UniProtKB/Swiss-Prot annotation:
Keywords: Amino-acid biosynthesis, Cytoplasm, Diaminopimelate biosynthesis, Lyase, Lysine biosynthesis, Schiff base
Any matching Pfam family: DHDPS
Role of this protein: Catalyzes the condensation of (S)-aspartate-beta-semialdehyde [(S)-ASA] and pyruvate to 4-hydroxy-tetrahydrodipicolinate (HTPA).
One CC-aspect GO term: cytosol
InterPro entries: Aldolase_TIM (IPR013785), DapA (IPR005263), DapA-like (IPR002220), Schiff_base-form_aldolases_AS (IPR020625), Schiff_base-form_aldolases_CS (IPR020624)
Protein name: 4-hydroxy-tetrahydrodipicolinate synthase
Subcellular location field: Cytoplasm
Transmembrane segments: none
Gene3D superfamilies named among the record's database cross-references: Aldolase class I
Annotated source species: Prochlorococcus marinus (strain MIT 9313)
Enzyme Commission number(s): 4.3.3.7
A GO MF term: 4-hydroxy-tetrahydrodipicolinate synthase activity
Length: 302
């Protein structure tokens, strides 16, 4: 086991589910189903839930819908489960307002994505995150780097400076490379809890110092992901690797097109009527849906 995994804190546990947002037949947020899904995910091994992140379709939810959903999930899972709110925006003022509101609703933390579209320089990113941290000093923050969606990347050196803010405690690494974890470790040491933002890279990232994952696949295989993490942490590398290899077909199937299109289809196929994504996202096309169904069937047999 990596010494980094031993030394780094785990402020939100090790397995967090980036929760989908259920919609009813009219396209409205299905709050009752969201509460049931949240409880199910916890029962299946999630230490915490991320509400209204990328997988939760935050770009097409109003802030009112997001705050309502957060409140319902918070109440559904009770105080023993970590609930993080996606509060990022490319407007610093909006992100501050969303983050302070999330704290008031009862979030245990905020997932704050790098500002998208306007592509700030590193100095602007630092000022943006510092302003959010200072506006909600009691709320732990998880910085979220996903350059494939945002168009810019938060540099490890910038993260190191932001750790002057006591509530900057964690980082979701979704750049698609394990080197991001290594560079964060070199710049920030072991105090920063780095979470993989990619199910397929969870095991490699654990080996270089990540502490866990913000997962999409845990909607479907939470217990297996938890078992893989525990096997790695207990020094059972071969067992962890067997889980990693067993789950690869599902990891790939869930990203055959834009997230959360496939995972919502997978949940529908598994008996959870979470509805289609909101436009401009579309339901999974029939050919991909059939392939996904076959993947799920095969997984049930292993």
């Amino acid at each position: 086991m990596s010494s980094a995994a031993e030394l780094s804190p785990t402020p939100f546990g090790r397995l967090l589910t980036a929760m989908v947002t259920p919609f009813d037949a009219d396209g409205c947020v299905d709050l009752a189903l969201a509460g049931r899904l949240a409880r199910y995910l916890v029962d299946e091994g999630s230490d915490g839930l991320v509400v209204c992140g990328t997988t939760g379709e935050s770009p097409t939810l109003s802030w009112q819908e997001q705050h309502q959903l957060l409140g319902v999930v918070r109440q559904a899972v009770g105080p023993g489960v970590k609930v993080l709110a996606g509060t990022g925006s490319n407007s610093t003022a909006e992100a501050i307002e969303a983050t302070t509101q999330a704290a008031a609703v009862g979030a245990d933390g905020a997932l704050v994505v790098v500002p998208y579209y306007n592509k700030p320089p590193q100095e602007g990113l630092e000022a943006h995150f510092r302003a959010i941290a200072q506006a909600a000093p009691e709320l732990p923050l998880m910085l979220y780097n996903i350059p494939g969606r945002t168009g810019c990347s938060l540099a490890p050196a910038t993260v190191a400076r932001l750790m002057e803010c006591p509530n900057v405690v964690s980082f979701k690494a979704a750049s698609g490379t394990t080197d991001e974890v290594t560079q964060l470790r070199l710049q920030c040491g072991s105090k920063l809890a780095v979470y993989s933002g990619d199910d397929g890279l969870l095991l490699p990232m654990l080996s270089v110092g990540a502490v866990g994952v913000v997962s999409v696949a845990s909607h479907l295989v939470g217990r297996r992901l938890k078992a893989m993490i525990e096997a790695y942490l207990n020094g059972q590398g071969a067992l962890a690797l067997s889980y990693h290899e067993q789950l690869q077909p599902l990891f790939k199937a869930l990203f055959v097109t834009t997230n959360p299109i496939p995972v919502k289809a997978a949940l529908e196929l598994s008996g959870w009527p979470v509805g289609s994504p909101r436009l401009p996202l579309l339901p999974l096309d029939p050919v991909m849906r059939d392939a996904l169904s076959n993947t799920l069937t095969a997984l049930c047999q292993t």
